Structures are given as structure tokens and as C-alpha cells.
UniProtKB/Swiss-Prot annotation:
InterPro entries: CBD_sf (IPR035971), Cellulose-bd_dom_fun (IPR000254), ConA-like_dom_sf (IPR013320), Glyco_hydro_7 (IPR001722), Glyco_hydro_7_sf (IPR037019). Residues 18-453 are annotated as: Catalytic. It comes from Hypocrea jecorina (strain ATCC 56765 / BCRC 32924 / NRRL 11460 / Rut C-30) (Trichoderma reesei). This is Exoglucanase 1. The keyword Disulfide bond applies.
Length: 514
């Protein structure tokens, strides 16, 4: 992703730290999800969510005096990084009333603008395994599915669901000065190596801090926090993108100044992470009628949809969607020498050749990225607006001086004048995103859990091996590749699977070569 503000225009006139105080109690909103087995049986898991430390009220450990006010630090409490960490603590969160975050069963909603004592914009949350530990997912060889409602997200907003290689305990075991840990949402990192984090590795980020020129609540410090990032879903009602970002070091590490690269540095490509990624945005790839608001689009964003992402052991990534009980594969793309709908090495090579850039391959491409997906990654869900590029990289023409004839420049139908945070916040304060029905398991396991109905309420299907009928003496038909669709109501493509795979029914509308 291009611009992921760690303080997505966050809580006004507050501060943050990495030890905990108790003036406000901390109770994580509960959120259930399902873990599925290869046989298709899914069991409910009891989890919760926690808001990132950067949103929290931070004050002196012995009083309610702010350590950070507006977009500047207290010179008394925070003269340097180490002293600030000793003097300041972060406090609990009133999730619904302050941050617009609510849960119900397996559903999480994040509101855009919430007005309480102060104004809050957006939020970033992590799924918890326990009260003090983030839930980790090993993506390689597995699939991840969820339902999402983006109907209320206009141009300029991003309801994101993604994974990062941050520490499961929030950094407590590595950095003794961080005593708040995952319980208070510490330890964030991503492929932009964000420098707007108030605390990194148990110390403040006050040294070298420069207040933002266009955001009264944020700034950039001397350090950043880097790690690999898998953007499963960056989207609003206009555009959506799927993007892996490798780093030469997989897990969380601190960086310094412009050596961080990414959004927050003058040298975007000067760090250890790939800030651009290998993105799959159907609109950018020329399919302008696949995703958008209204019945004229294949996927109608005025309605909830299911998103299923599969991580092959080869490192390739597959995607399909379900809406109103009908399954839709990722649309095919024709890009240079590449033709298909799988995000793989050939696709990423073709994208760089056609659209320009080499950051993804320079940082090791999918081979390096497999090192992240083969280990534990933390699930992040957020809603944010973009003070750096107005989200134009997701839903408009970007860079704005390019035209429709420039390969890859047009990413969505939004105007190049859209997405200005001040306008979006005033015009769409009630915007929200809802994520629900999270499932995780081996490839082919989450599409139709035992005893449940496929999306849209169709009768449950069974996971069985189906051999297509053959006619004696006829020539064999076309063969479907591994992970490709091989059957289902309304499907007319190849039904014979490649050698070593069989056609398995996931639901009445979708069978897949597995």
C-alpha cells in the first residue's frame, strides 16, 4: 500500500507511550472467527480486537498531563526518546464512544469520524489470541476468507484488512521498556516503515520529530518500524487491491531517517522493504466493470461480499469472491506476456515491465515474501484517509499528471481532485466498514463449512471428488490448472484438472482443482 498513516488522523490532542496506566479501563471488544480443517469442518474461535497504541491517550505516569499535544511533544516530559518512555504511559480505550469501534459476534464495524470529547478519525485494530497476545496466522498453504461491507466507503477512504510480521506479544520480550505490549496495541510495523509512530521498540520517537504541515495531529520522527506486509484487502466502494510487500528482513526492525524509505522518507526506495508491492487491482488491469457500486458491476459494492484468498506453497496467490450465492474468480488479466488470474512470479515480472518500477523484485519478490507467509503474521483491520496522496493510488489516476494512456496510471473512477481528508471527513463522517465471518484453514476448507450454508443461503454442498464424464473415442477437453475453477452452476469452462489434482465441490456454484 502506498500510504498507511499510523495515526490515520487519529485522536486529537492526545499522546501515546509503551507502558500502561489505568485512568481508563482496557476491555477488548470480543470477536469470534472460525478455524477450518481440510475436511471442511470449521470450529468457532473466541477472540477479541485491540486498538493500536498510536490512538491512545498518553500522559505522565503520575498525572493526566499529556505527553503529546496536537502534533508536538511535551518538552518537559519528553526531552529525548529514553526519558519520554520512562515518563509517559498509554491508557485504556473507550472503543465505541471514542473510536467508533463496535463488535457483535463475528462482526467488526469501524466508524470513520467519531465525536466525543474530541474528534477521532479512523482506527487500526489487531485480532487477539489472548488478552496479551496477538493472533498469528501462517498463510502459506492455507486460505483466508471474510465478508466485507464497503457500501459506505466513498472515494478517498480505505477499509483495509491485511497481515504484518509484527511480534505476537507487541515487542515485550525483546524490549523491556515496553511493558504495555499487545494488550495495549504496541509493536506495529509495515512495509512503509512508518515514522509517524510515537513509540518504537520501547522508546519514544521524539528525537528528530517534525510536526506535519497538513495534519494538526501527526508528525514524523527519526525512526521507523519495518516488516513484511500482505495486503489482502485495500478497498472502498470504487476500487480494491491485493498486494504482497516483501522486506529483506521479514520481522519487525527499527530503521532511521530517510534510510527507512517508504511513504515517510524523501528516498522512497532507500529502505529494506518494498513500499509499492505487486498489486492486483482489477480496474488498473483494465477490467473497469468488475467491481463497483450498482448492478452494472460484476461485484456490486452496495452489497456485502465474501473474499477468499489462497496462498499456494509455490508462493503464488489466488483469489475468488462470493456474492448473492454466486462465486466469481479473480478476473483474467492480459499484461505483456502474462495471461491469467493468478498473482505469481510471471505476473509480478510483467507488472513491473508494463507499469514501471523494480522495488518488488529488488526486495526479493514472491520468493522472499514466502518467508513471511511461512511464519506467523498478525491480522490488522483498519479504516483510514490519506494525508499524503488522498488515496488516489487506490481509486483514481495516479500520479495525477499521467493520463489514461499511461499504463497502470488509472486505478479507479474517482476524480483526481477527490480524497482530500478535510473534505472526506466533513462530507462523509458517518462512513464505516464492516468485516465479518472470518475463516482460516487449508486451501479449499473455508468455502462451505460443514453444517453451514454458502453465502446467499444456498443448500450446503459437500467436499467430494468429482470426475467429469468422458465420451469413449473423443479427444480430451481442455485441462484446468491447479487451483482453477472446474465446475459449478453456470460454469462452462474446463472440467478436467491438471495431473495430481482433482475437482472438488466447495459449494453448488464453485468447484476447484485441488
Amino acid at each position: 500500500m502506498y500510504r498507511k498513516l499510523a495515526v490515520i488522523s487519529a485522536f486529537l490532542a492526545t499522546a501515546r507511550a509503551q507502558s500502561a496506566c489505568t485512568l481508563q479501563s482496557e476491555t477488548h471488544p470480543p470477536l469470534t472467527w472460525q478455524k477450518c480443517s481440510s475436511g471442511g469442518t470449521c470450529t468457532q474461535q473466541t477472540g477479541s480486537v485491540v486498538i493500536d497504541a498510536n490512538w491512545r491517550w498518553t500522559h505522565a505516569t503520575n498525572s493526566s498531563t499529556n505527553c503529546y499535544d496536537g502534533n508536538t511533544w511535551s518538552s518537559t516530559l519528553c526531552p529525548d526518546n529514553e526519558t519520554c518512555a520512562k515518563n509517559c504511559c498509554l491508557d485504556g480505550a473507550a472503543y465505541a464512544s471514542t473510536y467508533g469501534v463496535t463488535t457483535s459476534g463475528n462482526s467488526l464495524s469501524i466508524g470513520f469520524v467519531t465525536q466525543s470529547a474530541q474528534k477521532n478519525v479512523g482506527a487500526r485494530l489487531y485480532l487477539m489470541a489472548s488478552d496479551t497476545t496477538y493472533q498469528e496466522f501462517t498463510l502459506l498453504g492455507n486460505e483466508f476468507s471474510f465478508d466485507v461491507d464497503v457500501s459506505q466507503l466513498p472515494c478517498g477512504l480505505n477499509g483495509a484488512l491485511y497481515f504484518v510480521s509484527m511480534d505476537a506479544d507487541g515487542g515485550v520480550s525483546k524490549y523491556p521498556t515496553n511493558t504495555a505490549g499487545a494488550k495495549y496495541g504496541t509493536g506495529y510495523c509495515d512495509s512503509q516503515c512508518p515514522r509517524d509512530l510515537k513509540f518504537i521498540n520501547g522508546q519514544a520517537n521524539v528525537e528528530g520529530w517534525e510536526p506535519s504541515s497538513n495534519n494538526a495531529n501527526t508528525g514524523i520522527g527519526g525512526h521507523g518500524s519495518c516488516c513484511s506486509e500482505m495486503d489482502i484487502w485495500e478497498a472502498n466502494s470504487i476500487s480494491e487491491a491485493l498486494t504482497p510487500h516483501p522486506c529483506t528482513t521479514v520481522g519487525q526492525e527499527i530503521c532511521e531517517g530517510d534510510g527507512c524509505g517508504g511513504t515517510y522518507s524523501d528516498n522512497r526506495y532507500g529502505g529494506t522493504c518494498d513500499p509499492d508491492g505487486c498489486d492486483w487491482n482489477p480496474y488498473r488491469l483494465g477490467n473497469t466493470s468488475f467491481y463497483g457500486p450498482g448492478s452494472s458491476f460484476t461485484l456490486d459494492t452496495t452489497k456485502k461480499l465474501t473474499v477468499v484468498t489462497q496462498f499456494e506453497t509455490s508462493g503464488a496467490i489466488n483469489r475468488y469472491y462470493v456474492q448473492n450465492g454466486v462465486t466469481f474468480q479473480q478476473p483474467n488479466a492480459e499484461l505483456g506476456s502474462y495471461s491469467g488470474n493468478e498473482l505469481n512470479d510471471d505476473y509480478c515480472t510483467a507488472e513491473e515491465a508494463e507499469f514501471g518500477g523494480s522495488s518488488f523484485s529488488d526486495k526479493g519478490g514472491l520468493t522472499q515474501f514466502k518467508k513471511a507467509t511461512s511464519g506467523g503474521m498478525v491480522l490488522v483491520m483498519s479504516l483510514w484517509d490519506d494525508y499524503y496522496a488522498n488515496m488516489l493510488w487506490l481509486d483514481s489516476t495516479y500520479p495525477t499528471n499521467e493520463t489514461s494512456s499511461t499504463p497502470g496510471a488509472v486505478r479507479g473512477s474517482c476524480s483526481t481532485s477527490s480524497g482530500v481528508p478535510a473534505q472526506v471527513e466533513s462530507q462523509s463522517p458517518n462512513a464505516k466498514v464492516t468485516f465479518s465471518n472470518i475463516k482460516f484453514g487449508p486451501i479449499g476448507s473455508t468455502g462451505n463449512p460443514s453444517g453451514g450454508n454458502p453465502p446467499g443461503g444456498n443448500p450446503p454442498g459437500t467436499t467430494t471428488t468429482r470426475r467429469p464424464a468422458t465420451t469413449t473415442g473423443s479427444s480430451p477437453g481442455p485441462t484446468q490448472s491447479h487451483y482453477g475453477q472446474c465446475g459449478g452452476i453456470g460454469y462452462s469452462g474446463p472440467t478436467v484438472c491438471a495431473s495430481g489434482t482433482t475437482c472438488q465441490v466447495l459449494n453448488p456454484y464453485y468447484s476447484q482443482c485441488l
